[in-house]
């Protein structure tokens, strides 16, 4: 049986980590693509040389030509400029939109059957543009946002409660940015909703509010500490979880940036929502009831994403 083929567009810190994780999890053969000559080849060779030690069999190919991604089953896009201290995700819009146009053309030509995961920021606008540039069906193009945001929220809560991260489940909706909406009443520890844990004295509402804000600022916190780049371990792990659910038809319920067609009152935009990811890509979008305050927060988040999409159209009118 032929191995799956995973194409990584962008061979920076996230791309290299993605390649290593794909090898460790034995998801398939990996093509690292980058416009910088030598970078994908060097990282691919380095990871391949670790395979005898880590005990996995996979082929790693570095390339500077999109032809190398031909026939890929999964394409994960990290290409673009990363955040620097003081930058918001939105500051990257103009530069990375041009990158998405080139990437979209490459995918359209060489990997039109692939399941595409976009990581490039500002995420919700970039995945929206990438789907349009590539022409791929919307259920086969998603953005990595909610899995990462949820992971951060889960980790911060596990620290607060001094429990295993495995016993914490959370719910994060909306855009991947300052306006994301972590939903406390749909988030639990061992099945106990967070508001009940506040009543039980496990934490205070003030502490919970601070954790929610820290989740919103999670990416910026790491950018501020690293100073020369942005997060890469957790984003890569999050995208690999999505790819694995698709390749193995696991049908995981994962929060991703998916194109909505009326759910939550939104049409033709990519927004973070819970989905079922299986062999057909986005197989279901789960729509939950929101109270008045949650709906207001969600609508604010959607409006922020809509503004970014309008800005994209201003730069590239063909997206309209």
Swiss-Prot record:
A GO term, aspect molecular function: L-malate dehydrogenase (NAD+) activity
UniProt feature coiled coil, ranges: none
Record field: catalytic activity: (S)-malate + NAD(+) = oxaloacetate + NADH + H(+)
Record's keyword terms, sorted: NAD, Oxidoreductase, Tricarboxylic acid cycle
Active site (UniProt): 176
Disulphide bridges: none
Binding positions (NAD(+)): 10-15, 34, 96, 119-121
Residues the record lists as binding substrate: 83, 89, 121, 152
InterPro entries to which the protein is assigned, alphabetical: L-lactate/malate_DH, Lactate/malate_DH_C, Lactate/malate_DH_N, Lactate_DH/Glyco_Ohase_4_C, Malate_DH_type3, NAD(P)-bd_dom_sf
EC top class named in words: oxidoreductase
Domain of life: Bacteria
GO biological processes: lactate metabolic process; tricarboxylic acid cycle
EC number: 1.1.1.37
Family classification: Belongs to the LDH/MDH superfamily. MDH type 3 family.
Reported function: Catalyzes the reversible oxidation of malate to oxaloacetate.
Protein name: Malate dehydrogenase
Species of provenance: Brucella abortus (strain 2308)
């Amino acid at each position: 049986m032929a191995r799956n083929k995973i194409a990584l567009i962008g061979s920076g810190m996230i791309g290299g980590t993605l390649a290593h994780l794909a090898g460790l999890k034995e998801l398939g053969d990996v093509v690292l693509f980058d416009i910088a000559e030598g970078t994908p080849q060097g990282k691919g060779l380095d990871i391949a040389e670790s395979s005898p030690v880590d005990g996995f069999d996979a082929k790693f190919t570095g390339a500077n030509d999109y032809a190398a991604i031909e026939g890929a089953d999964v394409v994960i896009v990290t290409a673009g400029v990363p955040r620097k201290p003081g930058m918001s995700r939105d500051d990257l819009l103009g530069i990375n939109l041009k990158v998405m146009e080139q990437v979209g053309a490459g995918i359209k030509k060489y990997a039109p059957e692939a399941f595409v995961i976009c990581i490039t920021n500002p995420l919700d606008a970039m995945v929206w543009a990438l789907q349009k540039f590539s022409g791929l069906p919307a259920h086969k193009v998603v953005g990595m946002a909610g899995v990462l945001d949820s992971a951060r929220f889960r980790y911060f809560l596990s620290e607060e409660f001094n429990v295993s991260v495995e016993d914490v489940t959370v719910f994060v909706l909306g855009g991947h940015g300052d306006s994301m909406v972590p939903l406390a009443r749909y988030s639990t520890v061992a099945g106990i909703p967070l508001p009940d844990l506040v009543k039980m004295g496990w934490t205070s509402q003030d502490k919970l509010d601070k954790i929610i804000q820290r989740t919103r600022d999670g990416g910026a916190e790491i950018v501020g500490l690293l100073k020369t780049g942005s997060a890469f371990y957790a984003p890569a792990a999050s995208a690999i979880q999505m790819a694995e659910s698709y390749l193995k038809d696991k049908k995981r319920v994962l929060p991703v940036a998916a194109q909505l067609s009326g759910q939550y009152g939104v049409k033709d935009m990519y927004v973070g929502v819970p989905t079922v990811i299986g062999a057909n890509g986005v197989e279901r979008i789960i729509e939950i009831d929101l109270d008045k305050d949650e709906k207001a927060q969600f609508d604010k988040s959607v409006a922020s994403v809509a503004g970014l999409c309008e800005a994209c159209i201003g730069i590239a009118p063909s997206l309209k």
